[in-house]
Amino acid sequence: MHSDPQSVDLVRREVIETAETLVVKVGTNVLSRDDATLDVDRIAGLVEAVSRVRATGRRVVVVSSGAVGAGIDVLDLGGRPEDLPHLQAAAAAGQARLIHHYDECLGQHGSHAAQLLLTADDFTER
């Protein structure tokens, strides 16, 4: 289709600039410091950028990783766990902290964060 990288970038930019709704997936690496803990300043920067886009009348949905990094801070683990039980504990403890930071930053722009809770029917009924 478009084999030229510049052409692909132009198409991507046009799609982003004309879309009514943008879905932004934020990976753990974007939100993590070198020590694997949560970088709250990155959340603030992301929220600032999202707010600027929303001010143009477009909808923005943020899908975020980062709960494990937030949980490392909460549980004072000193680094990313390797085993599944500790990863699960970090994610569980960190999810509330992550949502709190998003909500705090979004509140400064008149918005709120919410966690979408899915059921099995959400996958079978659509």
Give the location of each predicted region.
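Nucleotide/pyrophosphate-binding catalytic subdomain
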Residues: 1-126
